[in-house]
């Protein structure tokens, strides 16, 4: 191993989102994992974090990831099984609302990223995270601003996290009808705010968020009950 490790990475022109990953693989730092989260700003439902390792070669079947910022729901659903099929490894972690309340969003997010990387069946040589540094990883890592539009492995992780969470929120609507979880996915919208005012928060809401906390302080009734209709394993981890 050279005295200076990891070695300086030289970026050369490559195809689509693979430039950064290709440079890391060329310098012997693969496999490269991307990690991203969904649900950070929602006031209900879990925080979902995914880690994904793609191979060093560009796959035509995943070419749509080059434009991940513009992906609609149908395209994400189409890519979801393709990513799971061709990824060298992936792992999805679900952090429930009560843990988000207890830890705080940022700390829960960092912990989720650590768990997602630790759960990979292939140990990465390097980790690319979307937006901010993930301390405590046992391998080199790099935060990438706008990572889901800059690195294919982060874009793939973003799709895995988004589809997994959206499906869970649809199931949550069946358990807690009236809130519109299937539509707004737990984010604050006028319809969600109106439902909260009428029904009060349920067990899936984040009581540390001010719009929910205000209702609790005002004495709005709370609806208990947990999610029961999710796919097996979706309340914890998938990988």
Curated annotation (Swiss-Prot):
One record GO biological process: mismatch repair
Cofactor: record remark: Manganese or magnesium. Binds 1 divalent metal ion per monomer in the absence of substrate. May bind a second metal ion after substrate binding.
Matches recorded under PROSITE patterns: RNASE_H_2
GO molecular function: manganese ion binding; RNA binding; RNA-DNA hybrid ribonuclease activity
Binding site for a divalent metal cation: 36-37, 130
Places the protein is found: Cytoplasm
Keywords: Cytoplasm, Endonuclease, Hydrolase, Manganese, Metal-binding, Nuclease
GO CC terms, sorted: cytoplasm; ribonuclease H2 complex
Domain (RNase H type-2) ranges: 30-221
Cofactor(s), names only, from the UniProt record: Mn(2+); Mg(2+)
InterPro entries per the UniProt record, alphabetical: RNase_HII, RNase_HII/HIII, RNase_HII/HIII_dom, RNaseH-like_sf, RNaseH_sf
Keyword match Manganese: yes
Function: Endonuclease that specifically degrades the RNA of RNA-DNA hybrids.
NCBIfam families given in the database record: PRK00015.1-3 (NF000595), PRK00015.2-2 (NF000598), PRK00015.2-4 (NF000600)
Family stated for the protein in its record: Belongs to the RNase HII family.
Protein name: Ribonuclease HII
Lineage: Bacteria, Bacillati, Actinomycetota, Actinomycetes, Mycobacteriales
Gene this chain is encoded by: rnhB
């Amino acid at each position: 191993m050279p005295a200076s490790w990891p070695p300086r990475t030289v970026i050369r022109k490559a195809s689509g989102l693979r430039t950064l990953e290709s440079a890391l693989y060329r310098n012997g730092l693969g496999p490269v994992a991307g990690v991203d989260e969904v649900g950070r700003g929602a006031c209900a439902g879990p925080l979902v974090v995914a880690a994904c390792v793609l191979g060093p070669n560009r796959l035509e079947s995943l070419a749509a990831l080059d434009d991940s910022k513009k992906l609609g729901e149908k395209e994400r659903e189409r890519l979801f099984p393709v990513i799971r099929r061709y990824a060298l490894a992936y792992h999805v972690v679900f952090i429930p609302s009560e843990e988000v309340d207890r830890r705080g969003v940022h700390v829960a997010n960092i912990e989720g990223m650590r768990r997602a990387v630790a759960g990979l069946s292939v140990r990465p040589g390097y980790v690319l995270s979307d937006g901010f540094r993930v301390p405590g990883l046992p391998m080199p890592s790099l935060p990438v601003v706008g990572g889901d539009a800059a690195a294919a492995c982060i874009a793939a992780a973003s799709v895995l996290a988004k589809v997994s969470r959206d499906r869970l929120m649809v199931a949550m609507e069946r358990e807690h009808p009236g809130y519109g979880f299937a539509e707004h996915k737990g984010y604050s919208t006028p319809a969600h705010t109106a439902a909260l005012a009428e029904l009060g928060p349920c067990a899936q809401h984040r009581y540390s968020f001010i719009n929910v906390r205000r209702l609790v302080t005002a004495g709005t009734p709370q609806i208990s009950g947990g999610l029961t209709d999710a796919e097996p394993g979706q309340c914890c981890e998938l990988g």
